[in-house]
């Protein structure tokens, strides 16, 4: 499949989805998109800018959710035009799907909603590439049912995304077997390196996180041979309005991406060991 002008999957080099969890302001969106576009261009990594206009599943009613669909889409359109990069954003059950699909290149469905049949069908009917996040409660082989629903709309541009699985209360773990298992769906497989280190509800009224493990899990995922890496980043994660504890510090990303590119090339240049 293709996103904008580049191929995804089938042993192609990994692509990156990255940006702040939520659109905090137009200035921050432009600054982060510009920086990430420059870094990925220098490294030769295909890039999709990610940020959300609404975070509908925040822990607390008092948490910052975003700038709303109208302002958010206006900013994403400006990012896309200014830096010539594709963009991805989350959609929810009450999102005006057609309106969002006119602007973005990829629609992303939240993990909590992966079993909502009507929601998945309506998103996929927009005819855009869709990144479906696997629920924290779902076995990797059960994603085949989700993919079958999605492709029943005639949309073959479906990706599946691992973002950790619930491990008791307020904790997630990443089963790297999941990435290999989900390849059986025939869809490109994406690893969400930052939500996988989230501690859901770990700070009481908001989620915590362990960003120090993002590099570890990212490298492990590269060893599996993934098609895409999802990594939320922020200029100052400790001041982020959403998911700061598990966001990657933006100004440290270039050196790390360079390492991941080397790992990706090494793994994909080797024959698969069949047992």
UniProtKB/Swiss-Prot annotation:
Reactions it catalyzes: D-arabinose 5-phosphate + phosphoenolpyruvate + H2O = 3-deoxy-alpha-D-manno-2-octulosonate-8-phosphate + phosphate
Localization terms from the record: Cytoplasm
GO molecular function: 3-deoxy-8-phosphooctulonate synthase activity
EC number: 2.5.1.55
GO process annotations (BP): keto-3-deoxy-D-manno-octulosonic acid biosynthetic process
Key word Transferase present: yes
Keyword annotations of the record: Cytoplasm, Lipopolysaccharide biosynthesis, Transferase
One GO cellular component term noted in the UniProt record for this chain: cytoplasm
Pathway annotation from the record: Carbohydrate biosynthesis; 3-deoxy-D-manno-octulosonate biosynthesis; 3-deoxy-D-manno-octulosonate from D-ribulose 5-phosphate: step 2/3; Bacterial outer membrane biogenesis; lipopolysaccharide biosynthesis
Broad class of the protein's primary localization: cytoplasm
Transmembrane segments: none
Annotated InterPro entries: Aldolase_TIM, DAHP1/KDSA, KDO8P_synthase
PANTHER family registered for this protein in UniProt: PHOSPHO-2-DEHYDRO-3-DEOXYHEPTONATE ALDOLASE
HAMAP family per UniProt: KDO8P_synth
Family: Belongs to the KdsA family.
Name listed for the protein in its UniProt record: 2-dehydro-3-deoxyphosphooctonate aldolase
């Amino acid at each position: 499949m293709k996103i904008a002008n580049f191929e995804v999957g089938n042993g192609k080099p990994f692509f990156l989805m990255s940006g702040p969890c939520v659109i905090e302001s137009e200035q921050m969106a432009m600054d982060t998109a510009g920086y990430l576009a420059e870094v990925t261009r220098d490294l030769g990594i295909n890039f999709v800018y990610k940020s959300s206009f609404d975070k509908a599943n925040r822990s607390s009613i008092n948490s910052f959710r975003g700038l709303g669909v109208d302002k958010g889409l206006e900013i994403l359109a400006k990012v896309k035009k200014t830096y010539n990069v594709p963009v991805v954003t989350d959609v929810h059950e009450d999102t005006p799907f057609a309106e969002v699909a006119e602007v973005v290149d990829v629609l992303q469905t939240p993990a909590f909603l992966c079993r909502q049949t009507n929601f998945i069908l309506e998103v996929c009917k927009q005819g855009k590439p869709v990144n479906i996040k696997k629920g924290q409660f779902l076995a990797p082989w059960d994603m085949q049912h989700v993919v079958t629903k999605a492709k029943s709309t005639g949309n073959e541009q479906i990706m599946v995304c691992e973002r950790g699985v619930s491990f008791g209360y307020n904790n997630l773990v990443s089963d790297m077997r999941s990435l290999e298992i989900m390849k059986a769906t025939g869809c490109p497989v994406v690893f969400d390196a930052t939500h996988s280190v989230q501690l859901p509800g770990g700070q009481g009224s908001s989620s915590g996180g362990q960003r120090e493990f993002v590099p570890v899990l990212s490298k492990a995922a590269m060893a599996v041979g993934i098609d895409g890496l999802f990594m939320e980043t922020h200029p100052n994660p400790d001041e982020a309005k959403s998911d700061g504890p598990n966001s990657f510090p933006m100004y440290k990303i270039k050196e790390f991406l360079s390492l991941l590119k080397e790992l990706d090339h090494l793994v994909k240049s080797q024959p698969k060991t069949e047992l």
